[in-house]
Regions:
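Glycine-rich loop(s) and the adjacent beta-strand/alpha-helix scaffold that form part
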Residues: 1-82
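FAD-dependent oxidoreductase catalytic-site/capping-region signature
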Residues: 64-68, 78-277, 285-295
């Protein structure tokens, strides 16, 4: 089965899927294509490079004098009640967003604008997919909004069903390691604020005994996870930039009839969540395509 486009094809597979599809089509970094035995149809060295993401550091604090979702989810009976509350009244914990509180902050006074984003949840767990803790706790997740580290994503082989190889290279730059350590210190400062004193926060992760810069950086690597904001693997740029994949009209450089309209075209990651900027990119792509079609 095949499908042909009369005018244009628009790739919107995201910062992971788009470079993967390009490489499977023979478009990309010659050495990456050679590694999987894919003939080079169009060389573009920037495909799959420049991967950026927001690494979240999940600090956890045990609390007292208040219930959290950790407690309620230990009971099958209460789980059933939460389900019924949602089904019949569309209310309760199952209506909650992934985070119930967010804030922007600076890791140090050296930054002119906020370089951190916090997400706070009334629950905790050791790792995603594992059960919630049996003790009451809150999670203060903090991410570096402007990481300096860069990674890459490339096809693992010619099989389109095989997952691509993703190397984010988190904390590979000294600046990111410094911000990570300062972020944990700031999370501790927030937990120690007078307003939270009645709840007696006690640090569970990464551990109050970790105080040196080296220990905090190591802990950041252990408690850090993606916040699911991958971008920039098919970045927009000028013709003078050899790593640019698309031009200012989102057209794949050197090809006709192919555009990209997703988070992969961002030259740099945004200082906040990536969903709304991606919607803007899609709307702009539609506007550009309509304008070009009228020429």
């Amino acid at each position: 089965m095949s499908a042909l486009a009369r005018r244009e094809i628009v790739l919107t597979a995201g910062a992971i899927g788009t470079p993967h599809l390009l490489e499977l089509s023979g478009i990309g970094r010659p050495e990456a294509l050679a590694r999987i035995g894919q003939p080079v149809l169009h060389a573009l060295p920037g495909v799959g490079e420049n991967l950026q993401d927001h690494l979240q550091l999940r600090t956890i604090f045990k609390i007292g004098g208040a219930r959290t979702l950790n407690h309620d989810f230990q009971s099958r009976y209460k789980q059933a009640l939460m389900g019924l509350d949602y089904i019949f009244k569309r209310r309760g914990p199952l209506t909650m967003a992934p985070s119930q509180l967010g804030l922007f902050a600076k890791s140090s006074a050296d930054y002119a604008t906020a370089n951190l984003e916090f997400h706070v949840q009334p629950l905790s767990l050791d790792r995603f997919g594992e059960p919630l803790h049996k003790f009451p706790a809150i999670t203060l997740s903090v991410c570096n909004l402007r990481p300096a580290s860069r990674g890459h994503v490339h096809a693992a082989g010619k099989d389109s069903n095989a997952a691509p190889l993703i190397q984010p290279n988190y904390l590979s730059e000294e600046e990111d390691r410094r911000v990570a350590a300062d972020s944990i210190r700031l999370a501790r400062k927030i937990a120690g604020a007078p307003a939270l004193a009645p709840f007696k926060p006690q640090e569970y992760l990464p551990g109050a005994g970790l105080t040196s810069e080296e220990d905090l950086v190591k802990a950041a690597g252990e408690i850090g996870t993606t916040i699911f904001h991958p971008v920039s693997t098919a970045k927009m740029g000028r013709d003078s930039d050899p790593m640019a994949v698309v031009d200012v009209r989102l057209r794949v450089r050197g090809l006709t009839g192919l555009r990209i309209a997703d988070a992969s075209v961002m030259p740099r990651i945004t200082s906040g969540n990536t969903n709304s900027p991606t919607l803007m990119i899609a709307e702009k792509a539609a506007e550009l395509m309509l304008a070009d079609a009228k020429r």
